Amino acid sequence: MAALVVSETAEPGSRVGPGRGRISRGRLANQIPPEVLNNPQLQAAVQVLPSNYNFEIPKTIWRIQQAQAKKVALQMPEGLLLFACTIVDILERFTEAEVMVMGDVTYGACCVDDFTARALGVDFLVHYGHSCLVPMDTSVQDFRVLYVFVDIRIDTAHLLDSVRLTFTPGSSLALVSTIQFVSTLQAAAQELKADYHISVPQCKPLSPGEILGCTSPRLSKEVEAVVYLGDGRFHLESVMIANPNIPAYRYDPYGKVLSREYYDHQRMQATRQEAIAAARSAKSWGLILGTLGRQGSPKILEHLESQLRNLGLPFVRLLLSEIFPSKLSLLPEVDVWVQVACPRLSIDWGSAFPKPLLTPYEAAVALKDISWQQPYPMDFYSGSSLGPWTVNYGRDRAPRGLCQPASDKVQQGSRGGSPAPACESCNCADQKATSPAP
């Protein structure tokens, strides 16, 4: 599933900006022309890519052609970079655009790098592997962003068998995953609901079932276990931190193993509380704004600055694309750091830094804006976050709703189970964004 961000909308052939035709939103939905979709040469070229990875090549080519784009940039996580050269060759062969690969590290949707793309003269950016989390500031004409989720098909039957062998019928299970597996998650939920109380929780603006490393929903007390579909533990740990009393399981779609997973909540919380306690006696503060794509939020930075000014605490601002202990050690006069980039950097690696490295939430606790929360909040991009130390708090955009606790209702995906809700309910999908990006 892909989502398109455009700077203007008009009928095909209309002239908006210097020579770019625009298309209405109604024409954007799955109307790839037959000459593109059924092109035998294109079909043969796409066969080089893995058949279970949906890179949406025909749609991408059509979007580029419709935009009359001349310079296209591709941005993707490192796990997909091995396919980048092949995609470049295909796009350049079937469009008139020059295509380049943006090779800087891309950890998540927060790293979408439209700033660099525009600086390079790019008029069309394709971001692979993540949902459209960050609304684009499309006030600059003739720049578009296409999000390609890269839906990955897996052996759903094995997943279902694994769940049935592990959990007794009638169990209450919550299913979560990353965006690549949301369509499989929805299909599995439909199959399992006959024997289990299945919920696919949603933390808006994310899709039903989708979680991020920094954003996960609180589950209802009735949920007996949460099952995460995906490789690695980074995203799983997010929902575990938000729900410390619910047993967690991970199904690895590549290794085909369903395993019980554990997290040392006591150690994590003790470490973070120690850092907060140390920060309360700090006389000099450092505020780090992440510059890796759109990771940093100027709005949060401004809030922190205001709080420190009100308390008469001196601070220094530091812009960094990536944050390392060796870099911060070059400023020894700073007593405590607050990083507005990725909360998990502090949670996972904060103890590796010589000075306390707080998240904006932890800074709010240290400055007594809020008390320590149980469980630890994972609401950094949530539309129902706790306070102005999160990205979407108080933002003037269409109502997002709440981080929904799990219920016994399976969220229905549209268009055959694709993760369409990520785009249908997102302000940045196929329309002009109404607010600046964080």
Swiss-Prot record:
Listed InterPro entries: DPH1/DPH2 (IPR016435), DPH1/DPH2_1 (IPR042263), DPH1/DPH2_2 (IPR042264), DPH1/DPH2_3 (IPR042265)
Domain of life, per lineage: Eukaryota
Any GO MF annotation of the entry: 4 iron, 4 sulfur cluster binding
Pathway the protein contributes to: Protein modification; peptidyl-diphthamide biosynthesis
Summary of the knockout phenotype: Global developmental delay. Abnormal palatogenesis; palatine bone absent, micrognathia, cleft palate and small skull. Results in death during gestation or soon after birth with a small body size. May also result in preaxial polydactyly of the right hindlimb and abnormal hepatic development. Knockout mice leads to an increased frequency of tumor formation.
PTM-bearing positions, type Phosphoserine: S418
A GO biological-process term: fibroblast proliferation
This enzyme's EC code(s): 2.5.1.108
Entry keyword Translocase: no
Residues that bind [4Fe-4S] cluster: C110, C214, C342
Catalytic reaction(s) noted: L-histidyl-[translation elongation factor 2] + S-adenosyl-L-methionine = 2-[(3S)-amino-3-carboxypropyl]-L-histidyl-[translation elongation factor 2] + S-methyl-5'-thioadenosine + H(+)
Entry keyword annotation includes Transmembrane helix: no
Coiled coil: none
Expression sites (tissue/organ): Strongly expressed in kidney and liver. Moderately expressed in brain, skin and testis. Weakly expressed in heart, lung, small intestine, spleen, stomach and thymus.
Entry GO terms, CC: 2-(3-amino-3-carboxypropyl)histidine synthase complex; cell junction; cytoplasm; nucleoplasm; protein-containing complex
Cofactor(s) this protein cannot do without: [4Fe-4S] cluster
UniProt-annotated stretches for the region Disordered: 1-24, 402-438
Keywords: Cytoplasm, Iron, Iron-sulfur, Metal-binding, Nucleus, Phosphoprotein, S-adenosyl-L-methionine, Transferase, Tumor suppressor
Disulphide bridges, residue numbers: none
Cofactor note: Binds 1 [4Fe-4S] cluster per subunit. The cluster is coordinated with 3 cysteines and an exchangeable S-adenosyl-L-methionine.
Compartments where located: Nucleus; Cytoplasm
Family, as annotated: Belongs to the DPH1/DPH2 family. DPH1 subfamily.
Free-text function comment from the UniProt entry: Catalyzes the first step of diphthamide biosynthesis, a post-translational modification of histidine which occurs in elongation factor 2. DPH1 and DPH2 transfer a 3-amino-3-carboxypropyl (ACP) group from S-adenosyl-L-methionine (SAM) to a histidine residue, the reaction is assisted by a reduction system comprising DPH3 and a NADH-dependent reductase. Acts as a tumor suppressor.
Subunit structure: Component of the 2-(3-amino-3-carboxypropyl)histidine synthase complex composed of DPH1, DPH2, DPH3 and a NADH-dependent reductase. Interacts with DPH2. Interacts with RBM8A.
NCBIfam families: diphth2_R
The protein's name in its UniProt record: 2-(3-amino-3-carboxypropyl)histidine synthase subunit 1
Source organism of this protein record: Mus musculus (Mouse)
Gene expressing this chain: Dph1
